[in-house]
């Protein structure tokens, strides 16, 4: 399990909505990752749409997947 200090945080834009609350996100460095919504965002019913600016946390062990932790207004 990765510690909070080991997580890498990127900003990106949601390019596609996928089934099961998964999203394709284009990061600021040009890479595309598959990301899911964090638990607190699910709990508070925060909706994410295509084109939203988001923050994505990623573990250094798998840079193709991430967790969306924040949606910019």
Curated annotation (Swiss-Prot):
GO terms for cellular component: cytosol. It comes from the Bacteria. GO terms for molecular function: ribosome binding; rRNA binding; translation initiation factor activity. InterPro entries: NA-bd_OB-fold, RNA-binding_domain_S1_IF1, S1_domain, TIF_IF1. Gene3D superfamilies: Nucleic acid-binding proteins. Residues 1-73 form the S1-like domain. Coiled coil: none annotated. Keywords: Cytoplasm, Initiation factor, Protein biosynthesis, RNA-binding, rRNA-binding. One of the essential components for the initiation of protein synthesis. Stabilizes the binding of IF-2 and IF-3 on the 30S subunit to which N-formylmethionyl-tRNA(fMet) subsequently binds. Helps modulate mRNA selection, yielding the 30S pre-initiation complex (PIC). Upon addition of the 50S ribosomal subunit IF-1, IF-2 and IF-3 are released leaving the mature 70S translation initiation complex. NCBIfam families: infA. Component of the 30S ribosomal translation pre-initiation complex which assembles on the 30S ribosome in the order IF-2 and IF-3, IF-1 and N-formylmethionyl-tRNA(fMet); mRNA recruitment can occur at any time during PIC assembly. Belongs to the IF-1 family. This is Translation initiation factor IF-1.
